[in-house]
């Protein structure tokens, strides 16, 4: 079988599943993974594919057809134009979250002193590691309750050449950060914000494969905003920035104002959805 034939067959197989939103892209990612090809090689080469590799491709296609996210199948994804390792212990980074990173970078890119950043609920490390890459004078602490998630973040720091800028802390944020000194210039978080009752309405592949603890924000979706605002305060004049779910920006801004934050901003994403809430500690 030639590479072109393999691609055509793979595309057609995934197109049969209506719940797969990007069948051709997913099929190509699997083929590139199995055959160890780059994108340009996939598009320009028409090599003969050994039967064993074609069988392996079909085995991974079966996993995708069963609902496994393609990012978990190939073990990686792209975020902020960087490559990140992902597995079942971490949420798959979403493009929606890039505006959170971009917002912090934009506000601190001209700061010449060291910038101390705390990323709460770091998961794969995509948020904090991206900031470390694009803010070379930053020192980033990744905090997560999951040891397995932090192991992935450590690998991603190595992969993206920022290990020397990183610290890793395994902790429940409910225990606070008072022992982490000096205080942080920036606290950033993309916390669990889905209402508990709404979890079952998520896509099958999210419910069955991604870690629910990283999604469940309690009855009103705001539990972790309350906890973080209470337990993790940046230094005076420092910034806290959150990603928020649809319709939550006003509530989170209100929580921050009550806690003493000032100059609070709500920032929409490219689709006009209020996606980031930030404020400065008084």
Feature-to-residue mapping (PLM):
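Non-catalytic accessory regions of SAM-dependent methyltransferases
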Residues: 1-40, 47-49
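Mobile active-site "lid"/loop adjacent to the S-adenosyl-L-methionine
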Residues: 193-223
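Conserved SAM/SAH cofactor-binding pocket of Class I
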Residues: 96-201, 226
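Conserved Class I SAM-dependent methyltransferase catalytic core
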Residues: 219-280
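Conserved AdoMet
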Residues: 31-107
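Active-site beta-alpha loop architecture of Rossmann-like, nucleotide-cofactor-dependent enzymes
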Residues: 71, 194-197, 247
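Conserved hydrophobic residues forming the short capping helix/wall of the S-adenosyl-L-methionine
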Residues: 14, 108, 157, 232, ...
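Helix-to-beta-strand junctions that scaffold the AdoMet/dcAdoMet cofactor pocket
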Residues: 162, 210, 233-237
């Amino acid at each position: 079988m030639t590479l072109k034939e393999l691609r055509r067959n793979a595309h057609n197989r995934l197109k049969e599943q209506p719940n797969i939103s990007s069948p051709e892209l997913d099929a190509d990612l699997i083929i590139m993974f199995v055959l160890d090809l780059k994108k340009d090689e996939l598009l320009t080469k028409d090599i003969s594919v050994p039967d064993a590799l074609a069988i392996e491709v079909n085995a991974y296609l079966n996993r995708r057809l069963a609902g496994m996210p393609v990012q978990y199948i190939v073990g990686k994804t792209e975020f902020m134009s960087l490559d990140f390792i992902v597995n079942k212990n971490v949420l798959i980074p979403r493009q929606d979250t890039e505006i959170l990173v971009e917002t912090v970078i934009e506000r601190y890119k001209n700061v010449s002193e060291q910038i101390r950043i705390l990323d709460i609920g770091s998961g794969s490390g995509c948020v904090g590691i991206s900031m470390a890459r694009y803010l070379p004078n930053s020192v980033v602490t990744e905090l997560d309750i999951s040891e397995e998630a932090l192991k992935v973040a450590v690998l991603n720091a190595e992969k993206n050449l920022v290990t020397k800028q990183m610290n890793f802390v395994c902790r429940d944020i409910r225990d606070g950060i008072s022992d982490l000194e000096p205080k942080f210039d920036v606290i950033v978080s993309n916390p669990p914000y889905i209402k508990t009752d709404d979890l079952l309405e998520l896509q099958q592949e999210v419910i069955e494969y991604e870690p629910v603890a990283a999604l469940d924000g309690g009855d009103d979706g705001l539990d972790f905003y309350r906890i973080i605002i209470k337990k993790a305060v940046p230094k005076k004049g420092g910034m806290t920035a959150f990603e928020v779910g649809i319709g939550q920006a006003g509530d989170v801004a209100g929580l921050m104002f009550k806690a003493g934050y000032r100059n609070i901003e709500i920032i929409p994403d490219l689709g006009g959805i209020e996606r980031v809430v930030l404020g400065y500690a008084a």
